[in-house]
From Swiss-Prot:
Source species of the chain: Chlorobium phaeobacteroides (strain DSM 266 / SMG 266 / 2430)
UniProt keywords, alphabetically: Aminoacyl-tRNA synthetase, ATP-binding, Cytoplasm, Ligase, Nucleotide-binding, Protein biosynthesis
Protein name per Swiss-Prot or TrEMBL: Glutamate--tRNA ligase
Gene designation per UniProt: gltX
Protein's job: Catalyzes the attachment of glutamate to tRNA(Glu) in a two-step reaction: glutamate is first activated by ATP to form Glu-AMP and then transferred to the acceptor end of tRNA(Glu).
GO MF annotation terms: ATP binding; glutamate-tRNA ligase activity; tRNA binding; zinc ion binding
C-alpha cells in the first residue's frame, strides 16, 4: 500500500496585511509538511467580497516569498487541484450544496436581516445563546415550515440563504494533534449558513469542500477556529468523507497576556519589514511563538532549514504564546553578528547612495562607498547596531562630517586647556606615516603622559569632534577607518565650533 502524500495549506483572505499570526500559521504548515517531504499549498479564500482589499493578494504572496515560505501550488504556480482562488470555484460549491439539499442536510432560509436581529435580541434578553430559530426549517426535515410556503418564496424570487441542518443532541468529537480529545454538544451549534444570498459560499462550507477536494491530510490553523470544528466535522459526515487531521495553534498574546492586537503594537508583518527586521529573524522568532525544540537544547537561533528538520507538532504548546519584541530584537542582533559583510553591504550600499544624493559629504565618495571601506565600518559596528540600516543611520559620521556636537558631552569633557591640547595633538597626527589604531593610541598616550594627564583627557574630546557624539566603537579604530585627512579636518573645524558650547 502506497503511503498517502502529506499535504497542508495556508488559506488567507485578501483583506489587507498579513498578520504575524497568519505568518506563524503559514510557517508551521510549511515546516510540518516539508519535514514529511510533502506539498505546501497556498489557497486564497475570497468569498467575503465586502472585505476584499485591492492588492492584498499580491502583498500576501510577496510577504510569504520574503519569508522564504514558498508554496508548491498556488494561484500563480497552478497545480493539479486548482483553481486556487475560491471565487473561481463557485460552480463546485453549488454542486455540493445541491447534494446537501437533496440529502435533507440543508435547507432554504428566507429570513430577513431584521427578523434575524429581532430573534437575536430576544434570545439575549432570555439569557440564551443566540442561534437561528429554524423558522424556515421544512416540515419534512422536522421543522414547521410547509413546503408550499417555501415554493411560494422561490416563485417570487425572494432572496435566501442555504443553511445546514445540525442534528439535535449528538456529540461531535475529534482528536486535536495539539490539544488531544475535544468534544462538542450539537445543541450549542447554530444552523450555519452555507451559501449566502449573493451565491457565494461561507468560509465554513467552502473550506471543507476545498480541503477535501485538494486532498489535504492535515489542517493546521489558529485556536480561533476551534469553535467552528463541529460544523466542519458534520459537513464531512454529511458527505461521507474522511476528515483530515486537525491541529489548532495557541493564541498570540501581548506581554500582559491580552490577545495580540494593533492597539498594543504592530501586528502586520509588513510593519516589521519596514522597520528593518530581516526575514531570518522574523521567521526564527515566529517559529518559537508556541513551539520549542524541547528539554536538553539551548539553541535559540535557527535557520529555516534547521526549523524544517526539527519542527514537530508534538512540541507545540496549548497555552497562549507571548509576543515579546525584546526577544525579536535580540534575534535580529544575533543574525547581524553572524551575517557576512557582503550580504550587509548589499543592503546598506543603496541606503548610503540615497543619503549621498540628499546631502553633501566632505569625504571621498569613491572611498566611503567602496566595499573595503564598508567592511571596516561593519566590523566596527556589528556589536552596536540593531538593524542593518543602522550601519548608516546610527553611525553617519563614517560618511558625513558632523554638523552638530553633543552639548552635554562638550560641557562634561571640555576644560580650559582642551582646545589647546587638541591643536597640539593635530600636529602629532599629521606627522604620522602609518595612520593606524595602534600608532594613534601610542602617540596619544605619549602626548598626555608628560603633561600629567590621563588618556581620557583627549579620548572623549576627539570622539565628539570626529563623530559628533560621546559614544561609539573604539576611538582608535574609528579614527583609523575615517582616515588622516578626515580626522584632521574634523578636529580643526570642531575646535572652532565647541568654543561656543564649552
Amino acid at each position: 500500500m502506497v503511503a498517502q502524500r502529506y499535504r497542508t495549506r495556508f488559506a488567507p483572505s485578501p483583506t489587507g496585511y498579513l498578520h504575524v499570526g497568519g505568518l506563524r500559521t503559514a510557517l508551521y504548515n510549511y515546516l510540518f509538511v516539508k519535514k514529511m517531504k510533502g506539498d505546501f499549498v497556498l489557497r486564497i479564500e475570497d468569498t467575503d467580497r465586502s472585505r476584499r482589499v485591492e492588492g492584498a493578494q499580491q502583498n500576501l504572496l510577496k510577504t510569504l516569498e520574503w519569508a522564504g515560505i514558498v508554496p508548491d501550488e498556488s494561484p500563480e504556480l497552478g497545480g493539479d487541484f486548482g483553481p486556487y482562488i475560491q471565487s473561481e470555484r463557485l460552480e463546485i460549491y453549488k454542486k455540493y450544496c445541491d447534494e446537501l439539499l437533496e440529502g435533507k442536510y440543508a435547507y432554504y432560509c428566507f429570513a430577513t436581516s431584521e427578523e434575524l436581529e429581532e430573534n437575536r435580541q430576544l434570545q439575549l434578553k432570555q439569557g440564551l445563546q443566540p442561534k437561528y430559530n429554524r423558522k424556515w426549517l421544512p416540515e419534512e426535515m422536522g421543522g414547521s415550515m410547509p413546503s408550499s410556503e417555501i415554493r411560494k418564496k422561490m416563485e417570487q424570487n425572494a432572496p435566501y440563504v442555504i443553511r445546514m441542518k445540525v442534528p439535535d443532541y449528538v456529540s461531535v468529537w475529534f482528536e486535536d494533534l495539539i490539544r488531544g480529545p475535544v468534544e462538542f454538544d450539537s445543541s450549542t451549534i447554530d444552523d450555519q449558513v452555507l451559501m449566502k444570498s449573493d451565491g457565494f459560499p461561507t468560509y465554513h462550507f467552502a473550506s471543507v469542500i476545498d480541503d477535501h477536494l485538494m486532498e489535504f491530510t492535515h489542517i493546521i490553523r489558529g485556536e480561533e477556529w476551534l469553535p467552528s470544528m463541529p460544523k466542519h466535522l458534520l459537513l464531512y459526515e454529511f458527505f461521507g468523507w474522511e476528515p483530515p487531521k486537525f491541529a489548532h495553534l495557541p493564541l498570540l498574546l501581548n506581554p500582559d497576556r491580552s490577545k495580540l492586537s494593533k492597539r498594543q503594537g504592530d501586528v502586520a508583518v509588513e510593519d516589521y519589514i519596514r522597520k528593518g527586521y530581516s526575514a531570518e529573524a522574523i521567521v526564527n522568532f515566529v517559529a518559537m511563538l508556541g513551539w520549542n525544540e524541547g528539554e536538553g537544547t539551548e539553541q535559540e537561533v535557527y535557520s529555516l532549514e534547521q526549523l524544517v528538520e526539527r519542527f514537530s507538532l508534538e512540541r507545540v504548546g496549548k497555552a497562549g504564546a507571548i509576543f515579546n519584541v525584546d526577544k525579536l530584537n535580540w534575534l535580529e542582533k544575533q543574525y547581524i553578528k553572524s551575517r557576512s559583510a557582503d550580504r550587509i553591504i548589499a543592503v546598506i550600499k543603496p541606503l548610503l547612495m540615497a543619503e549621498l544624493e540628499k546631502r553633501p559629504t566632505a569625504m571621498h565618495e569613491s572611498v566611503i562607498t567602496s566595499d573595503l571601506y564598508l567592511e571596516q565600518v561593519i566590523e566596527l559596528m556589528r556589536e552596536r547596531v540593531g538593524f542593518e540600516h543602522e550601519f548608516v543611520t546610527f553611525s553617519p559620521y563614517f560618511f558625513f562630517d558632523p554638523e552638530t556636537y553633543e552639548e552635554e558631552g562638550v560641557r562634561k569633557r571640555w576644560t580650559a586647556e582642551t582646545n589647546t591640547l587638541l591643536r597640539e595633538f593635530v600636529t602629532v597626527l599629521a606627522s604620522l606615516d602609518a595612520f593606524t589604531a595602534e600608532a594613534i593610541e601610542t602617540e596619544l598616550k605619549a602626548f598626555v603622559a608628560p603633561k600629567g594627564l590621563k588618556a581620557a583627557a583627549l579620548i572623549h574630546p576627539l570622539r565628539i569632534l570626529c563623530s559628533g557624539v560621546s559614544f561609539g566603537p573604539s576611538l582608535y579604530h574609528m579614527l583609523e577607518v575615517l582616515g588622516k585627512d578626515a580626522v584632521i579636518r574634523r578636529i580643526s573645524r570642531g575646535i572652532e565650533t565647541v568654543v561656543c558650547l564649552s
